[in-house]
Amino acid sequence: MEPAGERFPEQRQVLILLLLLEVTLAGWEPRRYSVMEETERGSFVANLANDLGLGVGELAERGARVVSEDNEQGLQLDLQTGQLILNEKLDREKLCGPTEPCIMHFQVLLKKPLEVIRAELLVTDINDHSPEFPEREITLKIPETSSLGTVFPLKKARDLDVGSNNVQNYNISPNSHFHVSTRTRGDGRKYPELVLDTELDREEQAELRLTLTAVDGGSPPRSGTVQILILVLDANDNAPEFAQALYEVQVPENSPVGSLVVKVSARDLDTGTNGEISYSLYYSSEEINKPFELSSLSGEIRLIKKLDFETMSSYDLDIEASDGGGLSGKCSVSVKVLDVNDNFPELSISSLTSPIPENSPETEVALFRIRDRDSGENGKMICSIQDDVPFKLKPSVENFYRLVTEGALDRETRAEYNITITITDLGTPRLKTQHNITVLVSDVNDNAPAFTQTSYTLFVRENNSPALHIGSVSATDRDSGTNAQVTYSLLPPQDPHLPLASLVSINTDNGHLFALRSLDYEALQAFEFHVGATDRGSPALSSEALVRVLVLDANDNSPFVLYPLQNGSAPCTELVPRAAEPGYVVTKVVAVDGDSGQNAWLSYQLLKATEPGLFGVWAHNGEVRTARLLSERDVAKHRLVVLVKDNGEPPRSATATLQVLLVDGFSQPYLPLPEAAPAQAQADSLTVYLVVALASVSSLFLFSVLLFVAVRLCRRSRAASVGRYSVPEGPFPGHRVDVSGTGTLSQSYQYEVCLTGGSESNDFKFLKPIFPNIVSQDSRRKSEFLE
């Protein structure tokens, strides 16, 4: 319980002011219906569909329900016909007791939109109970000296029916001394009084027996009887007389058992036994008498049972004081029960919707009614929910409330809400009731799948096996159920020339990517595409991510020697003057490698030589140089084998064979002579050949210059279509050579006289210029560089 002085925070609180509600609804008259009690179950009461102006189908569509006080199911609404029928046989006396009229309050609830229609069912009384006296016989002691017209109160009969069906009249069997007078109390109840018509004489007749009959006003009337035994006494001049004819007292309903309610007091002027007074409850129903106990000696009335204001708010007791001589007096005690705040507020749920979709603002979650059985301030209530939930309360009529969502919910943020509805009355001390409602939030497909990365980079080494798993993409969906089930797909590539469908595939369930065929770094070094992730919601949502596939180079290409030409014909002969200094550049071996990175780093070394130590090869650039001074003792013809090796793992290599001819000077070169020719013939032939060669070289030199200019201009337009071999990235190691064409032969064009040692005709062969920077990416194009 909360203290009386507690201030309520300004939260979602709705103050239920009953008086204000009554004023608001004062002009809203409820619909009234009536039915007789004891009507059989299933009987027709009214056609609600017609009364409300609704079609029969609308009642079912709007979820029509009948809600009565205390959730009693006395009425039932047939949604198919719109008829209101009895769900059970009604007993007016059980429902309302002596209260008249007997009205059952109920409401008709309609949804979409919410509408509460108040209605009342009047249960009319039928005459199904006969009057009953509390005792079978009433004994009266009347002094023989009683004067004519003396009135003697009689115990009244009890009839559970009300109105005209209750007791309307009393009569007595014919006799010569008494008649019965029927009186009406302020509350409308009738009671009998016996009136003395003629004097009594004890000596003549000591006792009389009469029959008192109570008759109700029903049709047909019912009656009940009791025997009256009149004992004629000797004279007792004074009857007991109460100090007050009416005692009015107020008792709080929480008074403890045994507490004093009131003390009545009467006096008798007689003496002896005629003056001894005893008190008794004259007549009241068992329901009225049950909470009280009257002391016959002291007149004290005490509680023997706790009172309940909500069950019965007042009691009327009739007290009789009798003396020893048979005379008696009567008074009334009116006990008004004062209400205290002893009832906690009550809440009853009429409808509850759970789960609710997450994207549905202003959705009705629950419809409930509150009440407090106390009265006044004790019955006023405050209804609220906690602040940290996106819900609010909307008051309706007849203490009904709607719990609705305050805005759109987000299941991904919170999927379940525990809402505590707190009802606090304004009594002292304040009492409160809390009711917990669990609301589940159902998922709506409002979240698209999200990839764990906006882009993925995958590395695949070339020459892979088909169906190789090269990587995975992953996306998650914050929704649940089928809305969170993600399927993956390949999106059409932006490059229309990329054959994506033949390169990779994706597992639609888990996002695994597979290479469909073996990749070739030299043909395709990298490609990119987009993958999509789509959920199974309705409508489906999707997202995409970029995937880059980088093909890693493998050392699958051997070095290719561009110069000297290795085409299976006799190797060209390099001419070296014998006067050449050490370090003289004889020629340069030019080679390329189709791989990239360190797989394309080339190194050169002299593998074989006719005379070791005479020539050397620079490992960096493939230049063949003289290692020392030449002498006359050195043979004229030398054969060199140069090894070109890359830096791959395992390394690949190629060889180049060089023929070197030592001559005394370019004007009189030494030529290898055929072994079978005579010396004179060789000398004559050599002279002729040299003359022809010099003339030819001069002419061809001019022609070659012109041809070179034309070829350069022509090949510039074709340079874009000619592939280039990859060159290594980063710092180039000291012992490797870059084959990008920056060597000594890259900017020069050599025209050399090649002599075939085995030819008797000693023909000259002319080599066209070599362009080492323009290379081919396949074996077919490699041959095009040497015409």
Swiss-Prot record:
Which Pfam families did the record assign? Answer: Cadherin (PF00028), Cadherin_2 (PF08266), Cadherin_C_2 (PF16492)
Residue ranges in the Extracellular topological domain are 27-690
User: SMART domains given for it?
Assistant: CA
- Say if the entry is tagged with keyword Cell membrane: yes
Localization recorded for this chain is:
Cell membrane
Could you list this entry's UniProt keywords, alphabetically sorted: Calcium, Cell adhesion, Cell membrane, Glycoprotein, Membrane, Repeat, Signal, Transmembrane, Transmembrane helix
Please list which residues make up the signal peptide.
1-26
Cellular component aspect of the GO annotation: photoreceptor connecting cilium; plasma membrane
- Give me the Cytoplasmic side stretches, as residue ranges: 712-787
Q: Which residues are glycosylated?
A: N418, N436, N567
Quote the InterPro entries the UniProt record gives.
Cadherin-like_dom, Cadherin-like_sf, Cadherin_C, Cadherin_CS, Cadherin_N, Protocadherin/Cadherin-CA
* Membrane topology (UniProt): Single-pass type I membrane protein
Its BP terms in the Gene Ontology are: cell adhesion; homophilic cell adhesion via plasma membrane adhesion molecules; nervous system development
GO terms, molecular function? calcium ion binding
Per the record, the major location class is membrane
Q: Which domain of life is it from?
A: Eukaryota
Q: Which residues form the Cadherin domain?
A: 35-133, 138-242, 247-347, 352-451, 456-561, 568-671
* Regions crossing the membrane: 691-711
Q: Which PANTHER family match?
A: CADHERIN-87A, PROTOCADHERIN BETA-15
Q: What does this protein do?
A: Potential calcium-dependent cell-adhesion protein. May be involved in the establishment and maintenance of specific neuronal connections in the brain.
Q: What is this protein called?
A: Protocadherin beta-15
Q: Which organism is it from?
A: Pan troglodytes (Chimpanzee)
